[in-house]
Amino acid sequence: MGCNPPYLLPYRLRLLLFFTLCLTVVGWVTSNYFVDPIQVIPKAKVFMASFYKVIPLGKEETLVHDATMEKVELGNCPSVSPNLRGQSKLIFEPDLTLEEVQAKNPKVSGGRYHPEECKAVQRVAVLIPHRNREKHLTYLLEHLHPFLQRQQLDYGIYIIHQTGSKKFNRAKLLNVGYLEALKEQNWDCFIFHDVDLVPENDFNLYTCGDQPKHLVVGRNSTGYRLRYSKYFGGVTALSREQFFKVNGFSNNYWGWGGEDDDLRLRVELHKMKISRPNPDVGKYTMIFHTRDKGNEVNVDRMKLLHQMSRVWKTDGLSSCSYRLLSVEHNPLYTNITVDFWTGV
């Protein structure tokens, strides 16, 4: 009677093991509940690391997803702009200043402009030879900038200024403009533009085609009639390749006259045909002026014209020598100042 029955010990042992197992399970559950309650997923870890990372000023945009930085590709501008107005009545205010013209063209810098709503089909450089014509230049810029903007052109205006006392050389200045402008931009089209001619109709497109273009069909000073059938002066348009092919203008026309006919002969020599706009479109106002000192009539022009076919390969872009004094990017135009130390 003093000893426990042999079957009672296994029962108590089983009961003890049961309670021990229960306590173990409870301890495991509670330890996982109270210890490390927040499980940070990998993406959250990356976000938190980026959040606390020190970013130098000006570098915040590097956190923006690349897709948000992509610029929407613009479509090409139409061949004929919807902004054209046609014939305009030109007004020239006697007290107009360059500052006033600049205020009207806030999006122009260094004479450069491009449309924001579409991609221009051509890059156009307008080259204007100049000396002592500040008022004419102001009038031309006043009308030419909005004229070109309505045509939705990617353009730049270059004024090529001849300093010194030698006779004026329009053709050589235009060669200089072509060479210097190409150092800044690979222009598709070049407009060779007299400073005293202002276009009246913006359907007269300042672009280049398969053939050279003569844009001045008529002007007020000639009753809006063509000066003569083969006239190729005033304002002309040649592509980069066309002008290079004929070796540009001759450099030997000092004073007034002959250089535009020389260029026409070069164009014809290369079997190119000159096109013109409709007479109602190719109309210009010529701002009145007297003959400039240093731009007297070139009495040798006919002799030079007869030499063209023999000398065109060696007289032109390939032989254009000049001293470049400065290139200034003014708000309304880029001014290129040169000196010709040889010549008349």
Swiss-Prot record:
Q: Which residues cross the membrane?
A: 13-38
GO molecular function terms listed in the Swiss-Prot or TrEMBL record: metal ion binding; N-acetyllactosamine synthase activity; UDP-galactosyltransferase activity
Pathway in which the depicted protein is active: Protein modification; protein glycosylation
Q: What is its main location?
A: Golgi
**Disulfide topology:** C77-C118, C189-C208
The listed locations are:
Golgi apparatus, Golgi stack membrane
- What membrane topology is annotated for this entry? Single-pass type II membrane protein
Positions of glycan attachment: N220, N335
Q: What is the name attached to this protein's record?
A: Beta-1,4-galactosyltransferase 4
